[in-house]
Design a protein with these regions (language model features):
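Active-site region of glycoside hydrolase catalytic domains
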Residues: 1-175
Length: 175
């Protein structure tokens, strides 16, 4: 799965660079994220850690596409899993030269995560993600958490992290 992702990221960087070359530097090319804050289920440091790790997995593609390099946490995941990327000599330069200009994201609900196996066993579907129900939020009939403040938190998190123009592509009842 990591090599498939790597090839997608290389293709994205090449497409961004090509768009800038053909259309011009005024052309803006972005990437897309199924956005939404990941709250820890509790203030237990293990829950905070779990939520951060889950969020990292969600932001992995944008980390590479926005910064033009793999984040250290992803390299550690691959090392721990014994993954060897199909890395070509020019890939580092391709990623560095093909960073996106903006981040598009959809927001339908926030998500919640926990390290507690008993709570984790009660996950519910939230959009395309399985999440722990946040006891502080109401949910729609589809189980999506209704969290308009989460939209603002997501915007702030994305801008603080990437310093790129943001574009809300989709939103729904939860936002």
């Amino acid at each position: 799965k990591y090599n498939c992702a790597h090839h997608e990221l290389i293709a994205s960087a090449k497409a961004v660079k090509l768009a800038h070359e053909i259309i011009g530097e005024d052309c803006m090319v972005g990437c897309m994220l199924a956005g939404g804050s990941f709250y820890p289920y509790s203030c237990d440091p293990k829950d905070v850690w779990q939520a951060k790790q889950t969020e990292r997995g969600n932001y992995f593609f944008i980390d590479v596409q926005s910064r033009g390099r793999y984040p250290n946490y992803a390299l550690k995941w691959m090392e721990r899993d014994g993954v060897v990327l199909d890395w070509q000599e020019e890939d580092e330069q391709i990623l560095a030269e093909g960073t996106v200009d903006f981040i598009g994201f959809s927001y339908y609900c926030s998500r919640c995560d926990t390290a507690d196996p008993e709570v984790s066993a009660k996950r519910t579907a939230a959009n395309a993600f399985r999440t722990v129900r946040n006891p502080h939020l109401q949910a729609s009939e589809w189980g999506w958490q209704i969290d308009p403040l989460g939209l603002r938190l997501t915007q702030n998190d994305l801008y603080d992290k990437y310093q790129k123009t943001l574009f809300i592509c989709e939103t729904g009842m939860g936002g």
